Amino acid sequence: GFLMLGIFGRKYFKNTSGSIATTLLLVSTALALYTAYGYFFEYGKVDGIYQKLVPLKYTWLQFSEGVSIDMGIILDPISAMMLVVVTFISLMVHIYSLGYMKGDERFPVYYAFLGLFTFSMLGLVVSSNIFQIYIFWELVGVSSFLLIGYYYDKPSAVAACKKAFIVTRFADVGFLIGILILSFHSGTLDFNTLIDTLTSPETAGYKSAAAASFIGVSALTWGLALVFIGGAGKSAMFPLHIWLPDAMEGPTPVSALIHAATMVVAGVFLVARLFPVFAISSPNALTMVGYVGAISALIAALIACTQTDIKRVLAYSTMSQIGFMMFALGVSGYGGEAGLGYTASMFHLFTHAMFKAL
């Protein structure tokens, strides 16, 4: 949809681009619901435990005999849930935008950007390895930049999209360094293998990550902390929250998409994806997640009390709710998908997406 509308939209689909994009997303939503239903009620559970399934995996870049970058799809409880959240909220935004953006000169371009954003988020939530998630992470950043700055003739919108892009890029540098540290010690980019290696004290990867240290902190803790910084930037956690209120300069449906279902919960999703490593191998990093979440929730709530613009109140409300999700992850003892804090965080992510998008 993004490619079709982005390349040919203004020439061939000026009046029908919204209907085409919405129809395509309706199909995507139906497929996401079908996949989630099948996973949760048919084939996902073995002996009472939900499995991490990898239905698709192929080698993308082969550097040498043992060094390659794979691309794949992972299906587990959080990715199945996020498939439904992203497609459903995006579908609602597409439908609402049919009337809201009617008559806009760049109507096809708007839907092309929405399509790119949705594609990027779907790719992010089903990524089977940590480098693949980084690629889609950056695509989410680019598409949010395009959407926030959609009204490019408004100086405030231009300033807001640049601010969001630059602040999240700073955080993403930390994310990339964290990826390099974790993959160097685990010897893999694949999530399942990386988690197994870095949560098993007898493996060579765990021993090297725990032994190597910088200013008294292990390489494993540094790697996880840097990955969390990337997540904190995307999820507007203190002190990287400064871009979020200004992000309301985009069209109102875009604000619903960014502040509800997609971009701001990407950081929570990232911490949840690596949660076993945080909980088992580096409680200190998990404690940092909890503190940052709690501070962000409190500060955002206090700032929201002083705002007079309803859209900025919603922005700080979102920051506060994301803080609660991070806090729940930070205080959760490890129990797999049965950990109470983990479960509460994912449940709140789902419910917040629905009520905030309204």
Where do the language-model regions lie?
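Hydrophobic transmembrane alpha-helices and their helix-loop junctions in integral membrane proteins
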Residues: M92-I133, V142-L358
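Short phosphate-coordinating micro-motif centered on Lys-Gly-acidic
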Residues: E138
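N-terminal low-complexity, Ser/Thr- and acidic-residue-enriched intrinsically disordered segments
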Residues: G1-G6
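Transmembrane helix-loop-helix hairpins at membrane boundaries of multipass inner-membrane proteins
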Residues: F8-V84, F88-A112, H185-F214, R273-F275, ...
